[in-house]
Amino acid sequence: MVSDWKNFCLEKASRFRPTIDRPFFNIYLWDYFNRAVGWATAGRFQPKDFEFTVGKQPLSEPRPVLLFIAMYYVVIFGGRSLVKSCKPLKLRFISQVHNLMLTSVSFLWLILMVEQMLPIVYRHGLYFAVCNVESWTQPMETLYYLNYMTKFVEFADTVLMVLKHRKLTFLHTYHHGATALLCYNQLVGYTAVTWVPVTLNLAVHVLMYWYYFLSASGIRVWWKAWVTRLQIVQFMLDLIVVYYVLYQKIVAAYFKNACTPQCEDCLGSMTAIAAGAAILTSYLFLFISFYIEVYKRGSASGKKKINKNN
């Protein structure tokens, strides 16, 4: 009897054993996501039928994208001047909802992308996954667009900071605007390497927005510095891969005779890849500078104050 029950349980459990094609409990999440979104939008948006076309979807043309980003800067810097005379708002509940929503959405985009890219990387290798046209699939294009739209929702981070009278740093404001532009640039440039910085960024954002949610809930978190460290590591990994793809692109275009054993024209426009590399490089330097300023010099000055008091 016990043996039969054990075999029954093992048989049921085996149905949820992860595979390369279905890494999350042997469930193809993309199908469930497609059905859920189709139901929620009453069939108006079906992820499986989506195709990114410049001028067809919201914020798919350069002019409205640049206008939206410009409006973001006008609102936050103009708003900061307007609210100076007002009392800072706490907005605790709104901050909790905002951050919990973004950590959840980031996690959803992340697992859906991992589900799509894991079989490609496993069967064809990393080089294929960052260069070949077949790694730019319809589900990934849909997820890239949804992730891109999320970047405009993240602008609310800064609006909440302004209403709370929090200090705005150059890193924060530059990063938000540049990331929206970066995601758009990679979408229109059809760069196969896009999934690398996007998935790494989503993984960090899951932790980052969870940290913000806990902070908004009044919970003190000891691992705040680790979020910045992870962001720095993320940009380092991004740049290793992106600069390699840019190198391959340049060699394939101008120095065919100097090709490495693996050398092909990686999918994506040269301009999009170069612009992406430039923006990610600026992020790396800015985040390292921020980390030194806040966690290294800040802790050193704190120790000096303690010594003076003693």
From Swiss-Prot:
Residues 85-100, 164-174, 224-234, 293-310 are cytoplasmic. One of its GO terms (biological process) is fatty acid elongation, saturated fatty acid. InterPro entries: ELO_CS, ELO_fam. The C-terminal di-lysine motif may confer endoplasmic reticulum localization. The HxxHH motif is essential for ELOp function in vivo and 3-keto acyl-CoA synthase activity in vitro. The keyword Transmembrane helix applies. This is Fatty acid elongase 1. Its main location: endoplasmic reticulum. It holds the Pfam family ELO.
